[in-house]
Amino acid sequence: MALHDENVVWHSHPVTVQQRELHHGHRGVVLWFTGLSGSGKSTVAGALEEALHKLGVSTYLLDGDNVRHGLCSDLGFSDADRKENIRRVGEVANLMVEAGLVVLTAFISPHRAERQMVRERVGEGRFIEVFVDTPLAICEARDPKGLYKKARAGELRNFTGIDSVYEAPESAEIHLNGEQLVTNLVQQLLDLLRQNDIIRS
């Protein structure tokens, strides 16, 4: 908060997070999907949201491309803008967790420091880092948006995995093999959510 905002105060809500969670029938949590472009983050997150929806779980999916059409439309891809992009998404995700939702976020989020920033904002026990680990060669072969081709041709600068670093998680809550079938990965995630009493068995 800026120094000139000392008169802005926090207002507590009469309905607590616990009451909202009781209403939904499950805990609020963020599943933070991270990995290279083309690793399968959005695909797996979308499939998991569909599975959770069928189970009656209240969810919301925040996708890296989609938020840049609105919430983060003023940001580019410099290190500073990428950090601000993740900060904003983290704040939105935190609000949704406080509303009792299971929030799925699919962002490359290449730097450990930014992912840690969101973890600390949301709070331990409510942040699940999901590392979708897919070899660069596989991601590049998939290249659904043609971005790797542009990066290799020098038409796209600061592209993660090519000329911009990706810092892989060192202790993610779950490490997924991005070459496996999506259905297998979704089942692994559902098992994790049940084991941690986030959703009912």
From Swiss-Prot:
Keyword annotations of the record: ATP-binding, Kinase, Nucleotide-binding, Phosphoprotein, Transferase
Domain of life assignment: Bacteria
Binding site for ATP: 35-42
EC number: 2.7.1.25
Reactions mediated catalytically: adenosine 5'-phosphosulfate + ATP = 3'-phosphoadenylyl sulfate + ADP + H(+)
Biological or metabolic pathway of the protein: Sulfur metabolism; hydrogen sulfide biosynthesis; sulfite from sulfate: step 2/3
Active site: 109 (phosphoserine intermediate)
Top EC group: transferase
Record-level GO BP terms: hydrogen sulfide biosynthetic process; sulfate assimilation
Keyword Kinase annotated: yes
Sequence similarity: Belongs to the APS kinase family.
Task of the protein: Catalyzes the synthesis of activated sulfate.
Protein name, as recorded: Adenylyl-sulfate kinase
Source organism (scientific name): Escherichia coli (strain K12)
Taxonomic placement: Bacteria, Pseudomonadati, Pseudomonadota, Gammaproteobacteria, Enterobacterales
Originating gene: cysC
